[in-house]
């Protein structure tokens, strides 16, 4: 690495989705003296090499709202950034084997629906019908959204 001696108003460590997003939104707010410090090439580390996933099935309303905003960003990515990110929503299936986990899922579903998250509550039989390759023998149920 070259000797680099420069000052910046903001230094961001990491050029993945969090670092580049932070730099982008700082620039939108008029803070342009920003440097991103990344050891790899951009989009060549964990973010760029991941298959990615955005879910809205959280128990905390703040996390739900953040993920809903993320979905909007990814849905509009091509229009806003000129790059087709090939975003498509296919859903997340969460499975519960323990009664306590199942009760937590059901409680979370109430919160999710209250915040506009389209989520389904599924019995083991419904899960088996949609995903016949899954072993549902020990399941209490699942949620899909």
Summary of predicted features, one role per range:
Residues 3-18, 35:
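Beta1/beta-strand and adjacent pyrophosphate-binding region of the FAD-binding site
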Residues 4-5, 85-94, 130-145:
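Helix-loop-beta segment of a Rossmann-like dinucleotide-binding subdomain
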Residues 26-27, 112:
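Hydrophobic alpha-helical packing residues
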Residues 27-47:
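Glycine-rich FAD pyrophosphate-binding loop
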Residues 38-43, 82, 130-134:
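Short beta-strand/turn micro-motifs at beta-sheet edges
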Residues 52-130:
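Dinucleotide-binding Rossmann-like beta1-alpha1 core, especially the glycine-rich loop
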């Amino acid at each position: 690495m070259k000797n680099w001696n420069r000052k910046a108003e903001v230094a961001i460590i990491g050029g993945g989705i969090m670092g580049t997003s932070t730099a982008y939104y700082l620039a939108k707010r008029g803070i342009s003296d920003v440097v991103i410090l990344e050891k790899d090439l951009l989009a060549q580390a964990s973010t760029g090499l991941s298959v990615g996933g955005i879910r809205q099935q959280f128990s905390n309303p703040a996390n739900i709202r953040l993920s809903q905003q993320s979905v909007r960003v990814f849905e509009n990515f091509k229009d806003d950034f000129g790059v087709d990110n090939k975003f498509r929503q296919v859903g997340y299936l969460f499975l519960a084997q323990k009664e306590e986990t199942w009760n937590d899922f059901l409680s979370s579903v109430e919160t999710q629906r209250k915040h506009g998250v389209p989520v389904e509550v599924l019995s083991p039989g419904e899960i088996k019908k949609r995903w016949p390759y899954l072993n549902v023998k020990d399941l209490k149920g699942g949620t899909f959204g």
